[in-house]
Structures are given as structure tokens and as C-alpha cells.
């Protein structure tokens, strides 16, 4: 046993005769994280990763060396975790240090999470680790939508799928649909429902009996929904997008959607092109997984949403009369 500067360490030697031995004892004086790990932000339940972390031990004689063989605690991130303790032992001496981490608490109940938290989970591509298709969160729609004022409508948005059709529409996305009222799938209707009208701002696909210009140039996309807005935080005025809550709009991501953007009734494959949308309607194929009326080439670029593939009802009801079925644009 030897002591140096208050540090004690031991080593075992074998004495075979009357001989003098010089024993070098390696004594750890301190340990430090000299390069932070690559990943420092976690969600609750994730496992700490030391990848990229460099741990340096200072010996009692003042020398330094990069070490491995350290241990880390805790390994599973909890809501109250702010740092991970790193421990290293050598020569019978254990020294510790800490490295800071940030842990975001995730509730498995979708509605208990803020939209900012949901966005963070979406960005990490981990939505399905915490929530399920069909899970819902309540919002309030408030504002003028086209020519109709909707005042403080409580409605739930629900998950249609995780990373839906990601290779075409964009990765790390959670797709939601608006919406349900007390569990009933609804469509928003206005005072012109079931009547022909040329009124600008009515909930119609176009203001005349035409599909010229397809989805891209439709009255529904631009004037009613505001789906073509350049930013969800700067939406086109008097659109559904503008009437959504600000905290939801702050985290919305656009998706690349494929549809017939020429129109005219000719079933021409080249008419199917992409648009960037913040608030698109679902297509026939996304609802049904089959095509009857849409351009037959659309389905080559689309996928049925998991929510509807699971057999959930596609019947919509009027948002202001939830016992009355309604036709839905698609």
C-alpha cells in the first residue's frame, strides 16, 4: 500500500527473497468529460448514449490520459434527469464527474402534450413510440373561413399515420385530420351546403362547374383552406389555416402531395404533378385505398392512410349537426 498526496492505492507483489522492489502505483486524482457526447437531448424513456464523449483522467503525478471503461448513470432518461454521472476506477480509486443532458417529458396521452413537444417528437421520427393512429388532441377553430365565420368551434384533430408515404411526401411527419366532435368524424359545412353557388369563399371546390387547373389552382385550396400559404405562421387571411390555433400553426410542416393539377376530365398520367400543401384534403385513394373517379395515375404516388386502412368509418357528419351525414370533398 502506498500513499501520495493524500491518495492511497494498493498492489500485490510476491516476495521470493531478501530483495527490494520498486512498485509503480497508478492513482487517479480526478476525471473529467473533455468532449461532450454527440447526443445531449432526450425524451423520457430513451437510453443515454456516450457516443462522441471523451473522458480524461488526471493522475496523482499530474499526468493525463484519455480513458475508457467508465460507467454512466442513469442509463434511462427520466423527466427529472439533468445530468449523467460518469465514474472511472483505476488503482482501487474511483472518481466521478457529470455531463449535462436535457430531457423532454413525453406523455403517452397525446392530448397531454403541447404542440411544441409533439413537433419535437415528430422531428425525431419517434411519434409511433409514444402514440397510436387515431389518437386525438383538441383544438379550437376561430375566425373567418372563406365567407363563413366559425366561432370557437371545439374539435379534435386525430392521427392518420406516422411518416405516411414518406419517400414522396416528406419524412419525420405525423399526419393529422380535422376532425372529430365528441368522437364523431365531421366535415365543416357552410350555409350553402348542398346548394349550387358561385360565391367566393363558399366551401366549394371551385366557384363554377369546372375542375380546370386541378387541385393546384382550385378555389378550395387557395381561398377556403389556405393550403398553398407559404408559411403556416403567415397564413392567407380568411382561410381555415388562419383560423387554427397559433401554437398548432407554429409547428406545422408542409407535405408534398400528388394530384391531377390540370383537370379537364382527361385521364392523362402526365397531369399528375406535385404541390406543397399545409392543409390538403385527403384524396380518394388516401381514403379508400382504391380509385374510381380520380386520375388513374394518382394512386401511383399516393398511399392509403393507416387510419382508414384499419377499417375506420369514412362517413363524415356535419360539424353543426353531428347526427346528419355530409358529403366530403376529396
Protein language model features and the residues they cover:
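Serine/threonine-rich, repeat-prone extracellular segments and beta-strand-based repeat modules
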Residues: 1, 62-95
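Extracellular/surface recognition and adhesion modules
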Residues: 1-2, 13, 33, 55, ...
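Protein-protein interaction and targeting regions used for scaffolding, dimerization, and localization
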Residues: 7, 31, 37-42, 48, ...
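Edge beta-strands of extracellular beta-sandwich domains
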Residues: 8-15, 95-102
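Solvent-exposed, conformationally flexible loop/turn segments
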Residues: 16-19, 43-45, 79-80
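Extracellular interdomain linker/stem segments of modular secreted and single-pass surface proteins
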Residues: 16-22, 26-28, 103-107
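Solvent-exposed, low-complexity, repeat-rich "mucin-like" stalks and linkers
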Residues: 27-64
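Collagenous Gly-X-Y triple-helix signature in extracellular proteins
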Residues: 106-330
Amino acid at each position: 500500500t502506498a500513499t501520495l498526496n493524500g491518495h492511497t492505492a494498493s498492489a500485490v507483489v510476491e516476495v521470493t527473497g531478501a530483495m527490494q522492489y520498486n512498485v509503480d502505483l497508478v492513482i487517479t486524482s480526478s476525471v473529467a468529460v473533455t468532449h461532450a457526447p454527440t447526443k445531449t437531448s432526450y425524451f423520457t424513456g430513451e437510453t443515454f448514449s456516450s457516443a462522441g464523449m471523451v473522458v480524461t483522467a488526471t493522475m496523482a503525478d499530474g499526468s493525463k490520459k484519455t480513458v475508457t471503461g467508465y460507467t454512466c448513470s442513469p442509463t434511462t432518461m427520466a423527466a427529472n434527469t439533468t445530468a449523467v454521472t460518469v465514474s472511472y476506477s483505476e488503482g482501487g480509486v474511483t472518481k466521478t464527474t457529470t455531463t449535462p443532458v436535457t430531457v423532454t417529458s413525453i406523455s403517452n396521452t397525446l392530448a397531454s402534450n403541447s404542440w411544441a413537444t409533439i413537433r419535437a417528437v415528430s422531428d425525431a421520427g419517434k411519434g409511433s413510440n409514444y402514440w397510436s393512429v387515431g389518437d386525438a388532441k383538441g383544438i379550437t377553430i376561430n375566425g373567418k373561413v372563406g365567407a363563413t365565420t366559425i366561432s370557437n368551434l371545439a374539435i379534435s384533430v386525430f392521427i392518420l399515420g406516422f411518416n405516411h408515404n414518406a419517400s414522396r411526401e416528406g419524412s419525420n411527419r405525423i399526419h393529422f385530420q380535422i376532425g372529430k366532435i365528441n368522437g364523431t368524424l365531421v366535415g365543416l359545412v357552410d350555409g350553402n351546403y348542398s346548394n349550387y353557388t358561385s360565391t367566393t369563399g363558399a366551401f366549394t371546390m371551385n366557384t363554377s362547374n369546372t375542375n380546370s387547373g386541378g387541385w393546384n389552382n382550385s378555389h378550395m385550396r387557395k381561398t377556403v383552406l389556405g393550403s398553398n400559404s407559404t408559411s403556416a405562421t403567415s397564413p392567407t387571411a380568411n382561410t381555415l389555416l388562419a383560423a387554427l390555433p397559433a401554437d398548432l400553426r407554429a409547428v406545422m410542416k408542409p407535405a408534398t402531395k400528388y394530384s391531377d393539377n390540370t383537370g379537364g376530365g382527361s385521364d392523362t398520367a402526365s397531369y399528375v404533378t406535385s404541390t406543397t400543401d399545409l392543409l390538403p384534403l385527403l384524396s380518394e385513394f388516401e381514403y379508400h385505398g382504391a380509385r374510381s373517379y380520380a386520375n388513374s395515375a394518382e394512386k401511383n404516388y399516393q398511399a392509403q392512410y393507416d387510419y382508414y386502412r384499419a377499417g375506420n368509418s369514412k362517413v363524415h357528419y356535419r360539424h353543426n349537426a353531428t347526427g346528419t351525414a355530409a358529403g366530403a370533398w376529396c
